[in-house]
Amino acid sequence: KLDLPRYFTLQRNGGIKTIISIGENKIALISGSENNCFFAALILLKNGNELMRTKCLPEEPKNNDFNGLGSSNIHLDDFLYLTLGTPEKHVSKNSPLAQNNEYLFGKVLRIKKNELIKKIDNQTKDLKIDIFSKGHRVPQGLTRINNSIFNVEHGPKGGDELNLIIKNGNYGWPLVSYGTNYLKENGGDGKSINFNHELNNFN
């Protein structure tokens, strides 16, 4: 039986986005809706306790959507790496979050596993989460080869990417992409995006 908080929502492409194992503990990244706020949260599945909650998405809930929030996670050494995408609805407001360090959307996040265990055991109030890299659109695949981290990312209307993820890397979204903007109903303009990452000093 899953113990999910009352704010958990399946509406607008919400749901459980990834499951994380820390020892015998199972943690879920979920979509939430509460008091006109759409957000993502990490919760402990055995009791529904909240370990982390993002800031609200900037668009009004009636106009928002969780499609593109999808996530993946890996363990490397003493850290958990977790991806969090930028929801695709109303890209004019949501996409810029990938470049904004005040938000966790559009990032590869890094969490010390011992700090996560302390949070699970109620030994600390706040869970420290580091932004490992940013400028991601929909980073739905994450894997490791030896000590290197690779990410598969969905581009807009084509332009999918395979990236080597490095600390403090900036992968350019929404300023550069190999894809094409969607049309106006999603906040786009249907035009191609600047695709040259290197000349624009992005990874």
Located regions from the model:
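Beta-propeller domain segments
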Residues: 14-16, 86-203
